[in-house]
């Protein structure tokens, strides 16, 4: 409050009251607010809410968020595309946030996150917050509070309660169950939404302000205040509108920016980064491009908006993007943003932070950016927040005045504390100046006040944290001293005022992250991630705020393992993502945090995701680290993974996130990160973050790299990124994304996805081999099946984890996508690159596949498992693949995107894709192939590392792009939003295509970027989808396909097409949406991947590339309907072949020009969604028991789903997941795709 910048406004805010406290944070937020992230975080202040937000958003994982996003999107739609974008970002990021963002969109966004409003929410919601448990998680109330969005869908998803609980708890915070994809997340999201809206508005205001830059800020603040009063909501809307409008233009951008949220958006931030990614180029590019990208980012730019804000910052944002490069800028901003007065120092600070930022830098920078924006990025800040991390931290920390930022660092020491601390320590609220922990505590206290329930939990946690704090507090004490110096500004920043500690820059982020991440933080982290992603937002706030609650939430996420977290991440991511995207872009920034994360996240993400895994975060540092982490991860997969985490190897659901959180989170986080990244990353990271993060140093190097890693990793998650990621991991698996998708996602990621995954994971019972289960259960209900389905025991553990990992990756992917961006960006080539990447990825994927195949070779069960894993990876991959295949196509899409968006965006997107690919590739490779195998067999970073790094960098760019994309995406999503479209996608393959097209169109309209984001999201979503499928299957859309979902080949979830293929296609579709890419996507989608033996073959459907393809598809769909009737008759005649004819009655003709591959006797064909799995019993089975060949034909539908996701992705992850679920057949694809038939035991055996 004291900070000069805000003081007046703040005063007014104070006067305004009630939010005042929040506002302080909020203000910070405000600053934040814009930051949102921070703000958000702080704001979240609402700790509660904020936390909530985080959690919500974050937690919400992306999925939720995403899903929410959809809502968001819708909201966005309402709000603006930008909002959407924000959403996207948010989506990714928070989705929630975004959503909120969305809602606010602009506000985004930013605020979204920030909003997250949360804070407000928190106020409003504090009650909800208590939902902390997760039971409440659904916290529909939150939703109610928002009253805007309804997430019934999620509810319909109805994740398993425990999952939910976990999530919830994690989420918890927020509604958090949000973590559950279900409503909770939604709720959170919703809340966020509202909040966001509110906040957003707030933020938005901020954002807008941001956009408007400071003025707005002031206004913002004012508005903000109003908002505050409004609770945001009004404001938000109000503001929102205003903002949007306001921004719009910028707003849009803003939104986007807001996104900047997007800055978040993605950071746009990311984008911002992304460009940034561009990285630096972004930097310059960043800025410039950054803007451009940014712009596209612009969206990001919109970021810009942030830009505006940024634009103020702008560029900052963009810068951010660039920033990434910006990083510094951000940092600068960061500092800059922080308080004007502080600026200079801050800048310096920044500089250090730059790296820092990188760590958080991005964020920071983002933050800065945002921050700068005054808020404005604030929102971004969010992102930055993600920058979060840094931002968030950075933010808080960073901004924290330089001191603060530095202060953060010590936090890094505190990470463990924060991890635990994030759960509310009860610092003196009054003294925000005190350590973040204290602040967090303060916030947490507020939250606690607001959320006694949470407090209880948190208190418990706090006790732990306090213990840790006691251990670590000394440094914090030092920090306190410094912080005191910082005084208000830190507070303003987000209150996380950790005193600067030596090395604080890094520490700062890290600390932040850590703290955010805190593993527990982890959750936080996640949150962070989210937070981070949100990170900033969240992070910071989240952190703090979150910490308390959110953290808690995260915490659960952690439990979620990453899934949840990841999602959360996504959420975070989303959160961040949101932020990242949101800035999540915030999201990321959320995504990353992403960015944040990304940045960190990226790190994270880049960490992957993979890194994410990598911890990447550290890695994120990517890349390398990432890779190492990746490897590390691998180890995780190996038992080490399990062992690594104290967490039982059991699926995350068992994961204790808390105590273990750190490590498991770590792993999870890692994942999460990824996921986070995913979403966020993706975009967050992507851009900026990444880039930034990666960005080289910033990124990586610094970023986290060390930093991240450094500590973080220690935190591993901690890594800030991880933190986010860590959480991220969580997130990732959390998942996200977006989702992530996570953040968590299960974002976002990616997030829900992750979440879902997590959930799923949670749901999954590794104890018994699936097959056994299947045998025993026979055609047991899908839910049950799926729960178990996941994996076969032995491997399942590792696999499971792996799966999660992959999941993360998925998030990652998102991130990756972002990364791709990079890569692509790395070339803009993108396309080329992408393609190359894709190819590589594909190759990698294939390689991975090979690995996978090898795994497959080991035994069917294994095979299945692996495949599943792969799929998951693919999922992740999906993103990756998406990226991969997608990349290929996706790239194309990207290309399209590029075309549409800008090339930049597209590039970014492409890059993202590629990046993802890279990541994925690497990841994929790692994740995909690698992941697949990677996930399983080698987690070696393989190219993943480098790629990952690249990816990461790219990712950052990607993120930027992504952000942009996200922005675009949001826009697209708005279009998409049109869930109708979305649904349409569901509804028909063609539709889907169309949908994509819509997307495309939207993308086109919005930018392909959006699509890209979608893609990114897709990745997240995809996985998620799987998870959700289980739940989703219930959803009406999926009803027909329930069984389908139910039955992927064992070990395959619907999601689990051969690795990523389906996903790829999905992505492709997304891409597809994107334009030609659509075609490509279609092609990709069409591509038939055969998994068998070591290699996958992909073929393009003839029609996939034709524009007429869709028409053909439509015709085919019609035909397929007829065929279905015929087939139904025939099938009835063929009962002998299939016991489950009824289930297949709906089985429609294969997608156009695609023929299922049935091989040999017993060959089973299944549509998962439109995907066809062919199992050639005789062919591969006979030939090699171990290598049944799977012909997976990812059909566009998946892509569609992705799109859907994307859409949903906004929905994203949730929906994504759901959509994936859709994939499940894209329920709407029913015509095209019959429900999957259940395998009979016999078949299974044969199979």
UniProtKB/Swiss-Prot annotation:
Name this polypeptide is given: Uncharacterized protein DDB_G0283357
A biological-process GO annotation: positive regulation of transcription by RNA polymerase II
MF GO annotations: transcription coactivator activity
Region (Disordered): 25-141, 169-431, 472-667, 738-770, 807-857, 869-1087, 1099-1122, 1139-1162
Residue ranges of the TM segments: none
Compositionally biased residues, Pro residues: 1047-1060
Residue spans of biased composition, Polar residues class: 126-139, 342-356, 511-522, 929-942, 1026-1044, 1099-1108
Compositional bias of kind Low complexity: 26-125, 169-178, 185-223, 230-341, 363-375, 385-394, 409-431, 472-484, 523-544, 553-628, 655-667, 738-759, 807-855, 871-928, 943-983, 996-1021, 1064-1087, 1110-1122
Species per Swiss-Prot/TrEMBL record: Dictyostelium discoideum (Social amoeba)
Compositional bias (Basic residues): 984-995
Lineage, uppermost ranks: Eukaryota, Amoebozoa, Evosea, Eumycetozoa, Dictyostelia
GO annotation, cellular component aspect: mediator complex
